[in-house]
């Protein structure tokens, strides 16, 4: 797990994280999005470029973002650590209170890249 405080540099942090955690076949599944702006991030599936554009609007209060391998979909509710492990995501980013980001992954290389990107 990597913890990040994205205060006034939130856009730079988001852009770096998406780049660090995305591979050539990554699709991002967003759920539980709560944002200040209607044109920003919403629940759904995004390519890395689409996600960067949605995040650039800013105002993300809360969201869960799952980096999924292409061809794999998030199924069922993800509420526990066991659910995260079973869902097959490459990484999970949780944003709370507009600025606190937690990055979870079983891949140590992804966590290292996330820490360096922030």
Please state what every model-predicted region is.
Residues 1-21:
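Short, extreme N-terminal segment that most often corresponds to the first beta-strand
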Residues 6-10, 44, 58, 107:
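Intrinsic-disorder-associated interaction segments
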Residues 9-15, 38, 73-74, 102, ...:
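Short, surface-exposed beta-strand/loop "edge" segments at domain boundaries and coil↔beta transitions
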Residues 17-22, 55, 118:
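Hydrophobic, Leu/Ile/Phe/Ala-enriched alpha-helical segments that form helix-helix packing faces
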Residues 33-94:
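Surface-exposed, low-hydrophobicity interaction/linker segments
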Residues 83-118:
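Short, compact, well-ordered microdomains
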């Amino acid at each position: 797990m990597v913890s990040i405080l994205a205060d006034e540099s939130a856009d730079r942090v988001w852009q770096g994280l998406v780049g660090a955690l995305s591979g050539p076949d990554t699709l991002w599944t967003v759920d539980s999005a709560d944002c200040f702006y209607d044109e920003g991030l919403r629940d759904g599936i995004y390519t890395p470029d689409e996600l960067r554009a949605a995040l650039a609007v800013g105002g993300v209060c809360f969201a869960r973002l799952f980096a999924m391998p292409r061809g794999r979909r998030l199924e069922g509710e993800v509420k526990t650590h066991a659910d995260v492990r079973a869902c097959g995501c490459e990484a999970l980013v949780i944003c709370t209170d507009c600025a606190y980001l937690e990055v979870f992954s079983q891949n140590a290389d992804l966590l290292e890249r996330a820490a360096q990107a922030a």
